[in-house]
């Protein structure tokens, strides 16, 4: 399960419905053009927390139908509604997903015993493997080394998507749990995360920049740090431009420039403006056009 995973982007029609044809095109682009090792389905990049349970199920259905066995798939089923998380976990397990992920429960200030019960309930009810999704800058949930250790005592909890800038904690987790999977979650810090020993990475920009991400990862693993750093610099120039212009809107616009029907973002996200479109064209021409 190691390697570079795109956090799968989901295209929506102007009325907010899922653009199913476009979703299949994005999946194919990731597999055929970006050459990613896997897809992380149902995460933030898919605007997952703004869609219904039935819509989430449809995304999971399309992803596994289109990808089949060509890449690894991880299904993010997390929700502050534990019943929904379990329902989705059971559903995707029946579909054939071999591993789940779940964001730490957020909004309410859950204590660690509640967070632990949340993960153990999903694992127990589904019988599937679990990757913790730790993204404290959005959830407000910061877990300690000892808390990761408590969760990892469950043999079904096999790793973490580590989307945090605390690289001291990342190093400690890596040293303490050499047999657990660690995926870096910040695309702009892939190189230092790889040096610290992550097993792979999951990111939104890999939908359009997956080839560079794979280069950084492989070069760093082979101690070719100077070469990897040059590519990370270029990657971060691209990411800086994307973030300044609207993350999801810009990635979707760049996908359109690549001939992919990437649709629109789901409200309340804004529709992309003409000014944003023009800047996306500049980024595409400078960083991605062959």
From Swiss-Prot:
BP terms from Gene Ontology: carbohydrate metabolic process; N-acetylneuraminate catabolic process
GO-annotated cellular components: cytosol
Enzyme's top EC category: lyase
EC number annotated for this UniProt entry: 4.1.3.3
Entry GO MF terms: N-acetylneuraminate lyase activity
Task of the protein: Catalyzes the reversible aldol cleavage of N-acetylneuraminic acid (sialic acid; Neu5Ac) to form pyruvate and N-acetylmannosamine (ManNAc) via a Schiff base intermediate.
Xref: NCBIfam families: nanA (TIGR00683), PRK04147.1 (NF003164)
Protein name: N-acetylneuraminate lyase
Natural source organism: Fusobacterium nucleatum subsp. nucleatum (strain ATCC 25586 / DSM 15643 / BCRC 10681 / CIP 101130 / JCM 8532 / KCTC 2640 / LMG 13131 / VPI 4355)
Upper lineage: Bacteria, Fusobacteriati, Fusobacteriota, Fusobacteriia, Fusobacteriales
């Amino acid at each position: 399960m190691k390697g570079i995973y795109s956090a799968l982007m989901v295209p929506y029609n102007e009325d907010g419905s899922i653009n199913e044809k476009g979703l299949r095109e994005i999946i194919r682009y990731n597999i055929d053009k970006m050459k990613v090792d896997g897809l992380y389905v149902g995460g933030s990049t898919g605007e997952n927390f703004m869609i219904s349970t039935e819509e989430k199920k449809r995304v999971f259905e399309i992803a596994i139908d289109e990808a089949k066995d060509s890449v690894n798939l991880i299904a993010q089923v997390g929700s502050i509604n534990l019943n929904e998380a379990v329902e989705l976990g059971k559903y995707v397990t029946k579909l054939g997903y071999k591993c789940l992920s779940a964001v730490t429960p957020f909004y309410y200030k859950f204590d660690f015993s509640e967070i632990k019960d949340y993960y153990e309930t999903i694992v127990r009810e589904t019988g599937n493997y679990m990757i913790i999704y730790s993204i404290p800058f959005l959830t407000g949930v910061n877990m300690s080394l000892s808390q990761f250790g408590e969760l990892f005592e469950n043999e079904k909890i096999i790793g973490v998507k580590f989307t945090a800038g605390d690289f001291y904690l990342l190093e400690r987790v890596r040293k303490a749990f050499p047999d657990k999977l660690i995926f870096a979650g910040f695309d702009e810090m892939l190189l230092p995360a790889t040096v610290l020993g992550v097993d792979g990475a999951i990111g939104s920009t890999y939908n359009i920049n997956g080839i560079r991400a794979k280069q950084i990862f492989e070069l760093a693993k082979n101690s070719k740090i100077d070469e990897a750093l040059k590519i990370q610099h270029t990657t971060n120039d691209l990411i800086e431009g994307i973030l300044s212009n609207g993350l999801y809107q810009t990635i979707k616009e760049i996908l359109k420039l690549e001939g992919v029907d990437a649709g629109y973002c789901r409200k309340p996200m804004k529709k992309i403006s003409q000014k944003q479109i023009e800047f996306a064209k500049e980024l595409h021409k400078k960083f991605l056009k062959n």
